[in-house]
Design a protein with these regions (language model features):
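Conserved CoA-thioester-binding segment of acyl-CoA-metabolizing enzymes
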Residues: 2-96
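Glycine-rich beta-to-alpha active-site loop
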Residues: 143, 147-204
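Glycine- (often His-adjacent) and acidic-residue-rich active-site loop
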Residues: 15, 58, 90-150, 201
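Hydrophobic/aromatic residues within transmembrane alpha-helices
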Residues: 88, 107, 177-179
């Protein structure tokens, strides 16, 4: 815990209740009350949800399955009348190098001509497989997708503030998600920003960058 009163580290497990949603690439939590200081009985749900990328060994890169889970969590929060705000963040640090990241965009190892490819299995324990091994698991009969753009539209259509909490690297499609959020709060120590979509022949940033106010 932080040395400051009532200020947690990146994630204080005792402040959050895990939502009953089956996930492999994301985590989804509801903030719970500490008691009188929060104005509600201890343990009662507060109107804030935390949605986090959970692929830290891959700098929280997303694949189609990740995007499906992210969309589902955001939609649950959007449709829940007792949720007033959403924190979009990421878990970490990486077990490889102890580095922190928000999201590094799409997992290029499974990108094809039609978009990012679904895999036959979705276990998070296989994140460290080599590119050749990942390509062998691509679901051949299923179209690739680039539906992170659907997530961006959902974020803009949600009538509740979405706060991007940036614990580290945010690049490419991850950078676009940060821009599309209503507010971004970044770690002074670990946060770094980079837009690399053009380097991989993508224009995911087109929607997000149009929202920048200069």
């Amino acid at each position: 815990m932080s040395s400051l009163p009532f200020v947690s580290d990146t994630f204080a497990a005792d402040r959050w209740r895990q939502m009953d949603v089956d996930l492999t690439d994301m985590t989804f939590h509801r903030l719970i009350s500490r008691g009188e200081v929060d104005g509600a009985p201890a343990g009662e749900d507060l109107p804030v949800t935390r949605i986090a990328f959970d692929r830290p060994s891959l700098r929280n890169a997303f694949r189609p399955h990740t995007v499906d889970e992210l969309y589902r969590c955001l939609d649950i929060a959007r449709c829940s009348p007792d949720v007033a705000a959403v924190i979009l963040t990421a878990n970490g640090p990486s077990p490889k190098d102890s580095g922190y990241s928000f999201c590094s965009g799409g997992d290029q190892r499974i990108r094809g001509a039609a978009g990012y490819q679904y895999e036959t299995t979705q276990s998070s324990s296989d994140d460290d497989l080599a590119t050749s091994a990942r390509r062998e698991r691509i679901e051949k009969g299923r179209l690739g997708r680039l539906h992170i753009l659907e997530v961006q539209r959902l974020m803009r259509a949600t009538p509740k503030p979405i706060i991007a909490a940036i614990p580290g690297w945010t690049t490419g499609g991850g950078h676009s998600l940060m821009v599309v959020a209503d507010l971004a709060v970044a770690s002074r120590e670990h946060a770094q920003f980079k837009q690399v979509d053009a380097n991989v022949g993508s224009f995911d940033a087109g929607y997000g960058l149009s929202l920048i106010h200069i």
